[in-house]
């Protein structure tokens, strides 16, 4: 898709378009990307909507990050026009007279960039608000494509701790259940602090819809991406799982069931390891 539609690749804040690769490398604003996602989601819904094993739809995976491409710039300007109505109101709200950063039109506004303006607090805050709204708009299109195909099961998407790139409380309004991925860095000297922080994260997830949530991902042994990742002590996995349930989780799920043969997360912990053991 990236070869046929280069616009689907994200542009970094320094205005460099990313090469194909890694993940989370797609523009939520791109019409081409949205259309292909709609087609895939509808096909999935048409195929599995009546399957007795499908009780919930997991929308995308760990929405995150942002794109600064021309499509997103124009969408951001339209978002600002809708909020402020005229450029004078924007200048007043952002106090752009400081350092003579006054805008003459919305067309002059660019998202925060290390090679441009990144010191205006109002600009940074509104950009973050826009990123959340644009992500929600994309997510809702994903949900609508399922509904249009006749899928009636509830939907969720997995959050990541107190991730600061998106307003999870706003996103939670558009899904039926909140779910999240919990990967505490256990086995440190400050073990009680890790337990306190994990408890707070569970409470945050429950508070978003004022009802039980789902623990979508947890690791039965040790993740592969933490700086120091020790194996869990005997009984710790059970304690962490019970902690989630005690704070309102209706599930304890693992990533991954079987360790991958290759790729970035081949050494990520799993229920079944490379040797077939558990």
Where are these regions (language model features)?
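Polysaccharide-binding and catalytic clefts of secreted carbohydrate-active enzymes
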Residues: 4-177, 181-200
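Hydrophobic targeting/anchoring helices
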Residues: 15-19, 156-278
């Amino acid at each position: 898709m990236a070869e046929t539609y280069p616009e689907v690749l994200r542009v970094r804040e320094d205005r460099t378009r990313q090469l194909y690769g890694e993940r989370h490398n797609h523009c939520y604003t791109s019409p081409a990307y949205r259309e292909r996602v709609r087609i895939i989601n509808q096909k999935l819904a048409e195929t599995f909507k009546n399957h007795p094993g499908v009780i919930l739809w997991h929308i995308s995976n760990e929405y995150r990050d942002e794109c600064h491409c021309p499509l997103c710039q124009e969408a951001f300007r339209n978002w600002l026009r809708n909020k402020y109505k005229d450029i004078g109101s924007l200048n007043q709200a952002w106090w752009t007279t400081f350092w003579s950063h006054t805008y003459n039109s919305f067309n002059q506004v660019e998202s925060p960039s290390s090679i441009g303006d990144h010191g205006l607090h109002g600009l940074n805050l509104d950009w973050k608000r826009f990123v959340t709204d644009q992500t929600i708009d994309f997510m809702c299109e994903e949900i609508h494509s399922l509904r249009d195909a006749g899928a009636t099961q509830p939907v969720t998407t997995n959050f990541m701790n107190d991730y600061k790139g998106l307003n999870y409380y706003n996103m939670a309004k558009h899904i039926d259940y909140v779910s999240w991925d919990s990967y505490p860095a256990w086995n440190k000297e400050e073990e009680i602090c890790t337990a306190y922080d994990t408890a707070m994260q569970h409470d945050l997830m429950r508070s978003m819809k004022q009802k039980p949530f789902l623990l979508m991902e947890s690791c039965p042994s040790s993740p592969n991406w933490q700086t120091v990742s020790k194996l869990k002590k005997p009984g710790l996995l059970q304690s962490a799982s019970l902690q989630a349930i005690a704070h309102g989780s209706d599930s304890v799920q693992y990533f991954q069931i079987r360790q991958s043969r290759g790729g970035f997360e081949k050494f990520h912990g799993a229920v079944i390891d490379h040797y077939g053991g558990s």
